[in-house]
Design a protein with these regions (language model features):
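Soluble, non-transmembrane catalytic domains of enzymes that act on hydrophobic metabolites at membranes
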Residues: 1-12, 19, 26-27, 99, ...
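Conserved ATP-binding subdomain of kinase catalytic cores across diverse folds
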Residues: 18-122, 151, 155
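Active-site acidic catalytic loop and adjacent metal/ATP-binding pocket
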Residues: 40-45, 52-54, 148-193
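Short glycine/proline- and charge-enriched loop/turn segments
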Residues: 59-64, 128-133, 187, 200-206
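Alpha-helix N-cap and loop-to-helix initiation/capping positions
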Residues: 69-72, 138, 200
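Conserved kinase catalytic-core helix
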Residues: 80-83, 87-90, 119-161, 165-166
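C-lobe/activation-segment region of protein kinase-like
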Residues: 177-238
Length: 238
């Protein structure tokens, strides 16, 4: 059994799964054992020299009422990447996703995305002194961009599921009034749609509050911007 999403095939005659599976590069996340299988991430490059990230999995599945026998987790991540992109939520560009099940029912699965050029984790952005370099007006716009991004995701009833500060990436280009701020979300492996936007929002925002270093004042500012798009308050965020 084979499942494929291909944005760019290496060639008309080459099997894209085997092409990307056989590419080797530096391990960003060493293969680890979980969910009854193995998962790791490598940096590779395509024929044009673009930096790509390849998530490789063997027997790494999740179960749900729709998939009681198990489904590769990269397929759930693919669903989230495509859905969030359609909601104008910044996420890595999907190049290839595929899963193959052998006769012994063991899955091999692969997710390939384009590297986020110029983006850094929000905590690393602070640690590098970018807030001081850019000034408070730009910092306010960073909080605004994060709040708006999360609100768009939640209005689509999508829950990130693992929303820590390390999964929020920012890019600031230019300075002063001309500065542009972009936000991207990573690690969507646990993402899923909830029955309501409120449920998605409540889970993610409480999780982010616990796993971020923003002060109470900064958090209140982020939530203020969030509500300008989401349209209503989320209980229990303080």
């Amino acid at each position: 059994m084979t499942v494929d999403f291909v944005q760019q095939s290496p060639s008309a005659t080459e099997d894209p799964f085997e092409f990307y599976w056989n590419q080797q590069g530096e391990w960003v996340e060493e293969p680890n054992q979980r969910r009854g299988g193995e998962s790791g991430v490598q940096r590779i490059h395509d024929g044009e020299g673009r930096l790509l990230y390849a998530k490789r999995q063997v027997g790494h599945t999740y179960r749900s009422w729709r998939y009681p026998l198990g489904r590769p987790t990269v397929l759930r991540e693919q669903d989230a990447l495509l859905a969030l992109s359609a909601l104008s939520v910044g996420v890595p560009e999907l190049v290839y996703c595929g899963a193959q099940q052998a006769t012994d029912k063991q899955w091999r699965a692969l997710l390939v995305t384009v590297g986020l050029e110029g983006f850094v984790e929000i905590d690393n952005w602070y640690a590098a002194g970018e807030r001081e370099r850019c000034g408070e007006a730009v910092h306010d716009r960073v909080l605004e961009a994060i709040g708006h991004t999360l609100a768009r995701m939640h209005l689509g009833r999508w829950q990130h599921g693992c929303l820590y500060a390390k999964h929020v990436f920012v890019r600031v280009t230019g300075q002063g009034e001309g500065a542009e701020v972009d936000v991207a979300l990573l690690d969507l492996e646990k993402s899923r749609q909830r029955l309501t936007a409120q449920k998605a929002a409540s889970h993610d925002l409480k999780q982010l509050r616990r796993h971020s270093s923003w002060s109470a004042t900064e958090w209140d500012r982020l939530i203020y911007f969030y509500k300008t798009v989401f349209g209503s308050a989320i209980k229990g965020l303080r």
